[in-house]
């Protein structure tokens, strides 16, 4: 039996709304050496992971790629975009923070988001719940009470947003840490963007937070599928600007 020649292979996985695709490329020549496509398995008991496993393993088997050959795996997905289109989004709870006096009065109004309409014709929207804490009252106990209140109302993810939070993120970080301890997905408004005013910053964070569960589910499913195929290199996630980051970085 002829000895198998090892090679370095880069692989890419895309989980789309209709199809899950896998492409293999020679790391040295950049030649496409294999591709595979299967239907995205939304209805499988394992979710989209089943399709990822099938496409990834098919591509490796059909092109004689061994797990040890794989030096790079990148994952991209339209699942987040599809979540908006299909209304498959999480309910958001906003924990707003501001000082007292006139500043607090104005900020409280700016922080109180209404439901975010995605498709008016069919009534698709991001449900938003709000709570407000005065900055001087901000303690771990008070934060936990407010998070619990939002969760009881139906929130699935939390947004921490403070007036002038771009100048100091300590208060938003306190809320972030409390939510993390409860294993609740959380986003800090000032971490998402520092370019906009308070309302738009909070709204942007809420939109981002609403797709966190779907995004994490897809990424985790893809990572599990890659590991099940025997590939041990870190899974890289494609960013919107064309760059990549490790899945561990994305989870942060």
Placement of each model-derived feature along the sequence:
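N-terminally biased helix-coil "hinge/interface" segments that flank
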Residues: 2-252
């Amino acid at each position: 039996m002829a000895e198998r020649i090892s090679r370095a292979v880069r692989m890419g996985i895309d989980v789309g709304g209709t199809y899950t695709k896998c492409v293999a490329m020679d790391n040295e020549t950049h030649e496409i050496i294999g591709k595979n496509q299967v239907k995205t398995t939304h209805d499988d008991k394992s979710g989209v992971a089943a399709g990822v496993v099938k496409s990834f393993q098919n591509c490796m088997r059909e092109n004689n790629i061994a797990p040890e050959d794989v030096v790079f795996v990148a994952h991209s997905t339209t699942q987040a975009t599809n979540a908006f289109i299909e209304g498959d989004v999480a309910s958001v709870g906003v924990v707003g923070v501001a000082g007292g006096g006139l500043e607090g009065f104005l900020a409280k109004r700016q922080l109180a988001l209404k439901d975010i309409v995605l498709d008016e014709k069919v009534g698709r929207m991001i449900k938003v719940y709000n709570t407000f804490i005065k900055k001087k009252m901000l303690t771990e106990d008070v934060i936990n009470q407010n998070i619990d209140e939002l969760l009881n109302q139906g929130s699935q993810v939390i947004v921490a947003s403070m007036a002038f939070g771009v100048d100091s993120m300590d208060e938003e970080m306190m809320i972030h840490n409390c939510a993390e301890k409860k294993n609740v997905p959380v986003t800090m408004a000032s971490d998402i963007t520092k370019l906009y005013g308070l309302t738009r910053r909070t709204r942007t964070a809420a939109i981002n937070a609403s797709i966190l569960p779907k995004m994490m589910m897809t990424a985790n499913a893809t990572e599990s599928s890659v590991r099940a195929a025997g590939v041990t290199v870190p899974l890289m996630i494609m960013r919107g600007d064309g760059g990549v980051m490790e899945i561990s970085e994305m989870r942060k």
